[in-house]
UniProtKB/Swiss-Prot annotation:
<feature type="binding site">
    <location>
        <position position="367"/>
    </location>
    <ligand>
        <name>K(+)</name>
    </ligand>
</feature>
<feature type="domain" description="Histidine kinase">
    <location>
        <begin position="159"/>
        <end position="404"/>
    </location>
</feature>
<dbReference type="GO" id="GO:0008610">
    <property type="term" value="P:lipid biosynthetic process"/>
</dbReference>
<feature type="binding site">
    <location>
        <position position="367"/>
    </location>
    <ligand>
        <name>ATP</name>
    </ligand>
</feature>
<feature type="binding site">
    <location>
        <position position="279"/>
    </location>
    <ligand>
        <name>Mg(2+)</name>
    </ligand>
</feature>
<dbReference type="GO" id="GO:0004722">
    <property type="term" value="F:protein serine/threonine phosphatase activity"/>
</dbReference>
<dbReference type="Pfam" id="PF10436">
    <property type="entry name" value="BCDHK_Adom3"/>
</dbReference>
<keyword id="KW-0460">Magnesium</keyword>
<dbReference type="InterPro" id="IPR018955">
    <property type="entry name" value="BCDHK/PDK_N"/>
</dbReference>
<keyword id="KW-0479">Metal-binding</keyword>
<keyword id="KW-0007">Acetylation</keyword>
<dbReference type="GO" id="GO:0006574">
    <property type="term" value="P:valine catabolic process"/>
</dbReference>
<dbReference type="GO" id="GO:0004674">
    <property type="term" value="F:protein serine/threonine kinase activity"/>
</dbReference>
<feature type="binding site">
    <location>
        <position position="370"/>
    </location>
    <ligand>
        <name>ATP</name>
    </ligand>
</feature>
<comment type="subunit">
    <text>Homodimer. Homotetramer. Dimerizes through interaction of two opposing nucleotide-binding domains. Interacts with E2 component of the branched-chain alpha-ketoacid dehydrogenase (BCKDH) complex. Competes with BCKDK for binding to the E2 component; this interaction is modulated by branched-chain alpha-keto acids. At steady state, BCKDH holoenzyme contains BCKDK and BCKDHA is phosphorylated. In response to high levels of branched-chain alpha-keto acids, the inhibitory BCKDK is replaced by activating PPM1K leading to BCKDHA dephosphorylation and BCAA degradation.</text>
</comment>
<feature type="binding site">
    <location>
        <position position="330"/>
    </location>
    <ligand>
        <name>K(+)</name>
    </ligand>
</feature>
<keyword id="KW-0496">Mitochondrion</keyword>
């Protein structure tokens, strides 16, 4: 490939290399199929946006600012005001904070090896962030409730524009997998991009939800969350998927602190739980293909204390092979990794791309489910760990720190 031979696959100076993109892609287009030519044209068009804003001083200045992360307690006790001043305060915080966080992600896209950044799908996501930065910084300062209402419309639009970013990143990296030489660099990029996206969506959705008067909720924070109820919701969802795929699904038993209730943010659980449950059910069904209507139960244990919430999901799906155990929490997008048959690494019916509001989007099979869940848990001050009993099954431990516990909570 022309770009590979000229530019290589290592990091380069994007500001000096972007002018080469048009001519390089033109040469490449001569030897590609009609589909590839279409992709080249898309890349050329999208590069115009990236090129025109690449040296924009506003992005550079914002990227040097630190983000101001809030604790859920700050969000919970910021209070409601009769005159709506809490909405103005929240909106002004977002107006200051979102451009900074988005500028950080644009800087992250610049750090990618040039040949990966030229991928049309990756370029499209890069462009989405630049356009979002432009729209947010073009919005005038929020002075009154009318301004805040218009700002909410912009935030809703941007949330919708970015709803497929996880899927697009997975597609782009799989398309670019032969150019990935430093997987640690790409994994760091993904961890930062995906967790930043989660934080942005949580803050934005929280602000929008402050306009609603929903029982037991302050914004996106549920003041009396029941782990058992949210688990049951996603058990029903995962069982329907499993029944559609295999004709049956394991039963699920929930034990432990089933009566626990406490303030918490459901959104991370809405992202993580479907993935873990789907994996457990799939592993169970795949390891009992000879007896699909007589499979072991999946057992979920809830442990609640004054520091954190622990959810253990135990399946009898045969466990994870020793050779795969060290890699199961990694993002899988290379050719060699795509050939594995382990359910958690190369799923037959994909991984969930969860959108804002806790609704499940389309399924995608790029091996992003577990590593994304792990990154989310760590971002929220917790962890996601697996214990495999090869030949028996797997226990998955999800720990999430309380927002009102004895120790300091996480920051969003």
């Amino acid at each position: 490939m022309i770009l590979t031979s000229v530019l290589g696959s290592g990091p380069r100076s994007w500001s000096s290399l972007w002018p080469l993109l048009g001519s390089s892609l033109s040469l490449r287009a001569r030897s590609t199929s009609a589909t590839d030519t279409h992709h080249v044209e898309l890349a050329r068009e999208r590069s115009k946006t990236v090129t025109s804003f690449y040296n924009q001083s506003a992005i550079d200045v914002a990227a040097e600012k630190p983000s101001v992360r809030l604790t859920p307690t700050m969000m919970l006790y910021s209070g409601r005001s009769q005159d709506g001043s809490h909405l103005l305060k929240s909106g002004r915080y977002l107006q200051q904070e979102l451009p900074v966080r988005i500028a950080h992600r644009i800087k992250g896209f610049r750090s990618l090896p040039f040949i990966i950044g030229c991928n049309p799908t990756i370029l499209h996501v890069h462009e989405l962030y630049i356009r979002a930065f432009q729209k947010l910084t073009d919005f005038p300062p929020i002075k009154d409730q009318a301004d805040e209402a218009q700002y909410c419309q912009l935030v809703r639009q941007l949330l919708d524009d970015h709803k497929d970013v996880v899927t697009l990143l997975a597609e782009g990296l799989r398309e670019s997998r032969k150019h990935i030489q430093d997987e640690k660099l790409v994994r760091y990029f993904l961890d930062k991009t995906l967790t930043s996206r989660l934080g942005i969506r949580m803050l934005a959705t929280h602000h929008l939800a402050l306009h609603e008067d929903k029982p037991d909720f302050v914004g996106i924070i549920c003041t009396r969350l029941s782990p058992k109820k949210i688990i049951e919701k996603w058990v029903d969802f995962a069982r329907r998927l499993c029944e559609h795929k295999y004709g049956n699904a394991p039963r699920v038993r929930i034990n432990g602190h089933v009566a626990a209730r406490f303030p918490f943010i459901p959104m991370p659980l809405d992202y993580i739980l479907p993935e873990l449950l789907k994996n457990a059910m799939r592993a169970t069904m795949e390891s009992h293909l000879d007896t699909p209507y007589n499979v072991p139960d999946v057992v979920i244990t809830i442990a609640n204390n004054d520091i954190d919430l622990i959810i253990r999901i135990s399946d009898r799906g045969g466990g994870i092979a020793h050779k795969d155990l060290d890699r199961v929490m990694d993002y899988h997008f290379t050719t060699a990794e795509a050939s594995t048959q382990d359910p958690r690494i190369n799923p037959l019916f994909g991984h969930l791309d969860m959108h804002s509001g806790g609704q499940s989007g389309p399924m995608h099979g790029f091996g992003f489910g577990l590593p994304t869940s792990r990154a989310y848990a760590e971002y929220l001050g917790g962890s996601l760990q697996l214990q495999s009993l090869q030949g028996i099954g797997t226990d998955v431990y999800l720990r999430l720190r309380h927002i009102d516990g004895r120790e300091e909570s996480f920051r969003i």
